[in-house]
């Protein structure tokens, strides 16, 4: 999300008084971070003495994590964002742009990079794909040895430039940029408190901005501890990367909802990214995940680690393996490709059916379909061809024209389908309307039978950890039985991946995943659900800012010549 331009810098007085304006900026600066080729991990206790209340060190290495959105057009879960951080490479910004290319599937509506050169932070952000935002001329404006980057996916109305990350802030005492993958479930209450108690002025509609306001109001020293203190107020899902004039910092939430990995290039440069596919592209060797609750600090002295908040049971997002991550990534210590292949094999074992061919809804259903076909002993063929040139913004006022949307994206191969009993494997069903169109498309192409197999359990609850899902009332699996859904979409049979079999596949790691979208049981209760539980219709977040003038007691009213009332004391 892009910082708003032409805003005042935070003054020393504004830090202590509740009238503080926020120091967002969108103008370039620079910053040159010194670098040490240190391939060993320094003492992890080295930061503990700086904390006013020592934090527990040594996070559990089993912890790891994700982010997301549901598209009104194809109704698939959409990854809300991806993050990258690089320290110690003279080509940091260019490597950052390449890594963002690898993470493009996690967000297509905006991209940004902040680089550090000569003790200045400089930003380039834009709306669109990475290739559109970062042509060579823009990358040449981002010299330096450290950088962070972000790709964003948002719902309609939130794609404006000011919401494109990384966010960049100038404080009186330092400058910092942040990129965020996740969602703060206590964002509204934090923002209300900051506005009411500190006079904070927000410049975006993003929850990420609250982090920078928390840093501004923190009383901790040195600056690194302001970041740590700010993160201690956050609840929900977050994988954060920060860059300052001399440091690269990564923070992962205690539950490890969102993934964040660390690697190294051969020159010793440290790389942080949402997925290992980004490391692979820029020839960085995977080292490990950033543990849930861990803070990683990279500077010229090396790498330091401390634990923000430890948690005995991580709650990593299972949908990372079902849909979000690329198949060539390793997420939460598991191969995404192998996970999806196993999902398909389980479907073939648990829900077999007589068929002639197995096809996939491309691209996310392909690997599960391969697993299904191999287990069932039935040939896999490419029965649907996906067009990669149709944007999600294809919206027409006429329903008759709008119905062409699926046909624009998916074209049936008649030679594969005609007269065949077809098993079609997809990753999920959300509202069900797209599935019904796919079934109709296949039957119109000559399929004798269409059997839908879904490589995840039924989605019955909304996600509050970085995914813009429909309300529970809109989720078809929350309203209908499997048989009712089958009739609705028009398939000859329908089966989902059983949740208990999914957990069995995960083995000892099963307790370390979040299944809230399948069960409605949330590891961290969102504010929206708290309101429902307490019987509160809504919280008054605006503090009556837009209240009636007549209710303001200012010692009487006077009227000017135009009849406009002015308060007088």
Curated annotation (Swiss-Prot):
Q: What is its main location?
A: plastid
Where the record annotates domain Glutamine amidotransferase type-2, the positions are 81-301
Which molecular function term from Gene Ontology is one that the record holds? amidophosphoribosyltransferase activity
Spans annotated as Disordered: 1-51
In terms of SUPFAM superfamilies, this protein maps to: N-terminal nucleophile aminohydrolases (Ntn hydrolases), PRTase-like
Keyword check for Lipid biosynthesis: no
**EC number(s) per entry:** 2.4.2.14
Q: Where does [4Fe-4S] cluster bind?
A: 317, 463, 514, 517
Q: Where is the composition biased (Low complexity)?
A: 1-21
The record's InterPro entries line, in alphabetical order, gives: GATase_2_dom, Ntn_hydrolases_N, PRibTrfase_dom, PRTase-like, PurF, PurF_N
Q: Which positions are annotated as binding Mg(2+)?
A: 364, 426-427
> What GO terms describe the biological role, i.e. biological process, of this protein?
'de novo' IMP biosynthetic process; purine nucleobase biosynthetic process; purine nucleotide biosynthetic process
Its recorded name reads Amidophosphoribosyltransferase, chloroplastic
Q: Which organism is it from?
A: Glycine max (Soybean)
Classification lineage: Eukaryota, Viridiplantae, Streptophyta, Embryophyta, Tracheophyta
């Amino acid at each position: 999300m892009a910082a708003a331009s032409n805003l005042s810098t935070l003054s020393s007085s504004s830090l202590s008084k509740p009238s503080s304006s926020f120091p967002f900026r969108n103008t370039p600066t620079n910053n040159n971070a010194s670098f040490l080729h240190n391939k060993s991990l320094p003492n992890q206790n080295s930061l503990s003495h700086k904390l006013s209340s020592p934090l527990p060190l040594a996070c559990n290495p089993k912890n790891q994590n994700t982010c997301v959105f549901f598209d009104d057009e194809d109704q698939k879960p959409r990854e809300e964002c991806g993050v990258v951080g690089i320290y110690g490479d003279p080509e940091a910004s260019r490597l950052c742009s390449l890594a963002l290319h690898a993470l493009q599937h996690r967000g297509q509506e905006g991209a940004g990079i902040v680089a550090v050169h000569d003790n200045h932070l400089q930003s380039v952000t834009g709306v669109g794909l990475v290739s559109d935002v970062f042509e060579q001329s823009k990358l040449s404006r981002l010299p330096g040895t450290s950088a962070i980057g972000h790709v964003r996916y948002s719902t309609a109305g939130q794609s404006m430039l000011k919401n494109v990350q990384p966010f960049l802030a100038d404080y009186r005492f330092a400058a910092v940029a942040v990129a965020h993958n996740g969602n703060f479930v206590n964002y509204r209450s934090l923002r209300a408190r900051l506005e009411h108690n500190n006079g904070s002025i927000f410049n975006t509609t993003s929850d990420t901005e609250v982090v920078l306001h928390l840093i501004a109001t923190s009383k901790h020293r040195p600056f690194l501890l302001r970041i740590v203190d700010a993160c201690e107020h956050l609840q929900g899902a977050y994988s954060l990367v920060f860059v300052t004039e001399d440091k690269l910092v990564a923070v992962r939430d205690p539950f490890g909802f969102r993934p964040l990995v660390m690697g190294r290039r051969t020159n010793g440069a440290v790389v942080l990214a949402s997925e290992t596919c980004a490391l692979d592209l820029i020839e960085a060797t995977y080292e490990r995940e950033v543990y849930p609750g861990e803070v990683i600090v990279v500077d010229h002295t090396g790498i330091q680690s401390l634990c923000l908040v430890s948690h005995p049971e991580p709650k990593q997002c299972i949908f990372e393996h079902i849909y979000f991550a690329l198949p060539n990534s390793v997420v939460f210590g598991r191969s995404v490709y192998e996970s999806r292949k196993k999902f398909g094999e389980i479907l073939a074992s648990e829900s077999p059916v007589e068929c002639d061919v197995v096809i996939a809804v491309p691209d996310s259903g392909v690997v599960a379909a391969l697993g299904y076909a191999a287990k069932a002993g039935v040939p896999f063929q490419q029965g649907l061809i996906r067009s990669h040139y149709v944007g999600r913004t294809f919206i027409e006022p006429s329903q008759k024209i709008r119905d062409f949307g699926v046909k624009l994206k998916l074209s049936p191969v008649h030679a594969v389908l005609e007269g065949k009993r077809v098993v079609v494997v997809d990753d999920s069903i959300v509202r069900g309307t797209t599935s019904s169109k796919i079934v109709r498309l296949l039957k119109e192409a000559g399929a004798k039978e269409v059997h839908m197999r879904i490589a995840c359990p039924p989605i019955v609850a909304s996600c509050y950890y970085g995914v813009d899902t429909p309300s529970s009332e809109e989720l078809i699996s929350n309203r209908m039985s499997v048989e009712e859904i089958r009739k609705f979409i028009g398939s000859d049979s329908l089966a989902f991946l059983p949740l208990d079999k999914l957990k069995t596949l995960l083995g000892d790691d099963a307790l370390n995943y979040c299944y809230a979208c399948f069960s409605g049981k949330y590891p961290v209760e969102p504010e929206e659900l708290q309101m429902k539980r307490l019987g509160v219709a809504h919280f008054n977040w605006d503090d009556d800012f837009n209240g009636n003038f007549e209710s303001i007691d200012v010692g009487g009213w006077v009227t000017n010549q135009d009849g406009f009332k002015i308060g007088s004391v």
